[in-house]
Amino acid sequence: MHSKKSIQGSETVEQVSIEAPGSSSPQSNHNSSSDDEQDVQDDISQSDSDSLDSQASRKRRKTSQVLEDGDIPLIATTSVPSRVKAKSQNNLLEPKNFNNGAVLAPTDAQTTFAALDVKPWLVASLGAMAIKRPTGIQKGCIPEILKGRDCIGGSRTGSGKTVAFAVPILQKWAEDPFGIFALVLTPTRELALQIYEQFKAISSPQSLKAVLITGGSDMRPQATALAQRPHVVIATPGRLADHIRTSGEDTVCALRRVRMVVLDEADRLLASGSVGSMLPDVEECLSLLPPPSERQTLLFTATVTPEVRALKDMPRTLGKPPVFVCEVDTQALAIPSSLNQMHLQVPVTHREHYLHMFLLTEKNLPKSIVIFCNRTATADYLTHLLRLLEHRVTALHSKLPQRQRIDNLGRFRASAARILVATDVAARGLDIPEVGLVINYDVPRDPDDYIHRVGRTARAGRKGEAVTFVGQRDVQLILAIEKRVGRQMEAWTEEGVNLETRVIRESLKLVGEKKREAMLEIEEGREVGGKRKRGMKKLS
């Protein structure tokens, strides 16, 4: 491993970027009710789904043109500039250079956790979880965190960042077990639950007390759990900030002794200046902790932003080890090589028709699929519609009760539902095995959100596909995404399938009817499945 050092005042900051095995040569490169900060902008977004907007008010426009059999007009597909026509998969664009001169170095594929100074009980625990060898981010960060260094860890989604900070935290905690030893902040409830479960699994040989502090649950049991001095607290910033503001001194005083703090998905937590920014809540949480000079701060993310890099420039106490910056595949290889990226041109007025027929193609029918939307309203609408079209579907977005969100995610993981319709609350960090296809029903406005979305498939070296639906208003967004990931999308094709012909022949009338039923269910306040939501009255 090579390193490049630069002088920050009187201190040395080391940056290391590790090239993944099999890579090509390096290129130049406020409140607890709203814990799902990934979705805060849903209802005010300018990127409303054209399809839903054009159908939402039947007073303004007809939901769909219902045709008699045999009366089939030709649907004019969206005219998209030739720029987004099919390109060779090997046609690479020049990715942005975010590495700031970081050194790329190869790693030893035979490295073991024991070689990283991980204690035998942790090595055995990881082995029981079928985690035999460390990934690049784990090789880079674990030894340095064990040395007491603050750390910025950047690595693409699915690369094992949680283990990279959980293992050294647990090893250092076992040497001096007291509460509260570590605090982990993460943007969404689902991520918090996943991290909580990993801490419990890895620490199973020990008597670790971990507590989960997220919205959607009663605050009183959470306050009681905090007052009992758990060893590790995993929280969303909004709910923990609520406890700091409203709970008694007994609830929060133990936070003043925290030794280690982790900001997971740090780019999202530290983003400022946008509606729904979590930064104020994050700052309130950190204000109660010991000062940076007296604690170890760890930032992990798939996209290392300037706000994240700013940690290395913070004033530091004389004698404290310098910040360690480890970036593995964060930019040049942000998209896994095993991921096939494609686009599908669809007419704005018939997107649901195309989606229905696309899900039923011979190659897609056996796949486990995640469909991403920009708004919760769109996700709710598509869930109703696809269920009426007899797809096995469930949903994950911020407007669902917490218990239902956990149940829905469990159904999808257990393959009881083949399709998960989600907003960006599901885009970051969630480990959902065996997702074969990601569909961007709405094009994300931020290219980094695209990276997080498509990262739900092609995980751990598996193959995967991502298909983005493109309308006439989306071309510039596609260009921005291609520039960010350094690769052009191919046009979607499947041998023997003419999607437009199938839409015309098979889905116009059926989908039109089911769209009206779905909109009626939503207007009457019914849940997916037709039951009326508790407390909702039928609209007169």
From Swiss-Prot:
Picking any one GO biological process from the record gives: rRNA processing
Q: What is its EC number?
A: 3.6.4.13
Q: What does this protein do?
A: ATP-binding RNA helicase involved in 40S ribosomal subunit biogenesis and is required for the normal formation of 18S rRNAs through pre-rRNA processing at A0, A1 and A2 sites. Required for vegetative growth.
Keywords in alphabetical order, please. ATP-binding, Helicase, Hydrolase, Nucleotide-binding, Nucleus, Ribosome biogenesis, RNA-binding, rRNA processing
Q: Motif DEAD box residues?
A: 264-267
Which residues hold ATP?
Answer: 155-162
Compositional bias of type Polar residues: which residue ranges? 1-15
- Main localisation: nucleus
Molecular functions per Gene Ontology = ATP binding; ATP hydrolysis activity; RNA binding; RNA helicase activity
Domain comment in the entry:
The Q motif is unique to and characteristic of the DEAD box family of RNA helicases and controls ATP binding and hydrolysis.
Which chemical reaction does it catalyze? ATP + H2O = ADP + phosphate + H(+)
The cross-references to SUPFAM superfamilies, in alphabetical order and at most eight, read: P-loop containing nucleoside triphosphate hydrolases
Q: Where is this region: Disordered?
A: 1-65
Short name of one Pfam family for this protein?
Helicase_C
Does the entry feature the keyword 4Fe-4S, yes or no?
A: no
Q: Where is the composition biased (Low complexity)?
A: 23-32, 43-55
Q: What is this protein called?
A: ATP-dependent RNA helicase dbp8
Q: Where is this motif: Q motif?
A: 111-139
Q: Broadest EC class? A: hydrolase
Subcellular localization, per the record? Nucleus, Nucleolus
Ranges for domain Helicase ATP-binding: 142-322
Domain of life, per lineage: Eukaryota
Q: Which InterPro entries match?
A: DEAD/DEAH_box_helicase_dom, DEAD_box_RNA_helicase, Helicase_ATP-bd, Helicase_C-like, P-loop_NTPase, RNA-helicase_DEAD-box_CS, RNA_helicase_DEAD_Q_motif
User: What organism, scientifically named, is this protein from?
Assistant: Sclerotinia sclerotiorum (strain ATCC 18683 / 1980 / Ss-1) (White mold)
Residue stretches making up the Helicase C-terminal domain: 354-505
Q: Name one GO cellular component term.
A: nucleus
Q: Which family does it belong to?
A: Belongs to the DEAD box helicase family. DDX49/DBP8 subfamily.
